[in-house]
């Protein structure tokens, strides 16, 4: 049930709708790579080695081709590598080795550093994740600074001035404000949060969406701020895989709680028989009621309810009085007619008037009609 609801919510999500309604874009090739890579990261979070390392390695291999989909997707691949490195567990082991607890027999720093490097080379998954980070950043940089300028008549990357990356780094507070203003940005971010029932941001996998969100919201091109066209397509598998990761983690938590229920009951019974002076009389824990309430929600809320909410939030923009999503056009009588409007007739005449082999300037509405073949 959970899988069916998640699949329905993903298929009806605004990012998929808008991309299907718009003209085909190369970002569509990113979806299978993102889905398979993030899917392996979800599985890695539920396994121990060697199964975990195997899933992390597969996640890195599936993410590597993202660098060839579009110039910014290399940064997304690098972010997947960072999440894979964290999920591999190697960083925790490296930190414990470099900064051990106080002990009489702590080796010198350089031997500890060599041990960390040796562990990195031998740890399956950690090396692949690190190399994926380097791979993604390398190809994004090379694409924007070498490959694309070669094919440009002015030998430059035409979109370089759309995002002031160095300005954002010099003034991060202003960049943070620009992420949410003007209102079109806040509305797009709100819709992105809502389509994943808000809970998807709890997963570490949600960080994979940050590069795409950053370049869109920091861009000077106002069309990037909106939830239309194909711009949100690559975010949809990230949102729903992150939501799946949250649900899987909740399921695993419930399983662990059920497995230890007998031990907890025995401990509670033992505490009940203690004398009053033996019981813990420390100061009251003001946060305990909130923790208990959160624990009760996690343990008792049906898992299928979360993807159901995601599906409801996904369908809601289609069914409003003033729908904003393409599927709402199915109820428009104009959608079912074959009669062309005067604008469409004029566009067809303009296309027919262009000689074969001629070069013309056009907008996006008829560009595909002018492509040979």
Regions found by a protein language model. Give the residues of each.
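Specific aromatic-rich, kink-prone transmembrane helix
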Residues: 9, 28-47, 55-63, 238
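Membrane-lumen/periplasm interface segments of specific transmembrane helices
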Residues: 90, 121-200, 205-211, 310-320
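Signature aromatic-anchored transmembrane alpha helix within multi-pass, membrane-resident enzymes
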Residues: 133-137, 251-270, 275-324
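Transmembrane-embedded, aromatic-rich helix segments that form part
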Residues: 57-66, 71-87, 132, 208
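Aromatic- and kink-enriched transmembrane "portal" helix at the membrane-lumen/periplasm boundary
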Residues: 3-31, 40, 63-64, 68, ...
